[in-house]
């Protein structure tokens, strides 16, 4: 069985970002993204334009959630979809703590 080729997260983001008047949406649902990919994503400055981020149905764990919550570029994020990932109560706590600190997740 052949291994999947590595994901070029920057190319994927540039291909999938949908720019609108009020902000951008980024739909990365069901792309086999893991924690390493979310770590790369969380360091992309273009994320600061995103108001809606769909990361549902991937392979993201609490580690990826924490990387996303720690990103300096999520200040405009209003909607985050993480359905059907590998997130536990610990990941949910990271999200809740981000919300308490004034982030808009």
Model-found features: residue ranges?
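Leucine-rich tandem repeat or coiled-coil scaffolds
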Residues: 1-105
